[in-house]
């Protein structure tokens, strides 16, 4: 995943937020302004204690950082990478899935990035939406909630099951809806004020595909 793709996708992603609810979108910039995000892996982004030769170090500090985590315990992707069990992969420690080093906490630990908005996308590939929906992954939801609570100075844009209607994700619509709701309710029940959840369709989806998951 390269930095240019991350910037382009996040500008589009944020634009969707603003147009979807221009009167009440949480963390929206003032009219006429946009937030630029950089990502999508630690090495490409830079600005952390371990990785210091990326976008942040060579171009400048963006308005936000884009990052991905997985709720997919024990699942193996097409590159032969098996995801961690017992924790949200890519959230509190560094890992890699054949797309660069991934560690969200590294950005939060960096004084350089102390004013950045955090975009956190959650993947539930490998039919993991079923386990989120039925409560089997409640320990992962708790880890996510604790993470957001522990960093109240940073706004989080949480994109649950991003591109949910894309064929590459193969999410079951009823279980996806339940999984999305379960994560949102946990964040709301914790009375956190530093997050907004994002319902993000894939760019090529038809209205009929979108409605299946709505």
Question: What are the language-model segments listed below?
Answer:
Residues 14-17, 154:
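Coiled-coil-like amphipathic alpha-helices with heptad-repeat character
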Residues 33-151:
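N-terminal carbohydrate-binding/catalytic regions of secreted carbohydrate-active enzymes
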């Amino acid at each position: 995943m390269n930095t240019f793709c991350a910037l382009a996708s996040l500008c589009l992603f944020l634009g969707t937020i603003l147009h979807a609810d221009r009167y009440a979108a949480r963390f929206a910039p003032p009219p006429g302004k946009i937030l630029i995000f950089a990502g999508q892996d630690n090495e490409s982004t830079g600005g952390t204690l371990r990785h210091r030769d990326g976008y942040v170090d060579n171009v400048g500090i963006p308005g936000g950082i884009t990052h991905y985590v997985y709720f997919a315990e024990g699942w193996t992707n097409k590159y032969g990478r098996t995801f961690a069990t017992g924790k949200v992969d890519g959230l509190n420690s560094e890992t890699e899935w054949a797309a660069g080093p991934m560690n969200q906490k590294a950005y939060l630990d960096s004084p350089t990035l102390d004013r950045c908005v955090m975009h956190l996308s959650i993947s539930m590939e490998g039919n993991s939406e079923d386990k989120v929906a039925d409560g089997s992954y409640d320990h992962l939801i708790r880890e996510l909630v604790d993470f957001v609570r522990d960093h109240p100075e940073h706004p989080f844009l949480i994109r649950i099951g991003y591109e949910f209607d894309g064929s590459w994700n193969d999410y079951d619509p009823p279980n996806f809806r339940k999984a999305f709701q379960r994560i949102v309710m946990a964040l709301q029940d914790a009375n956190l004020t530093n997050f907004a959840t994002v319902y993000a369709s894939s760019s090529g989806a038809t209205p009929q595909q979108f409605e299946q998951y709505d």
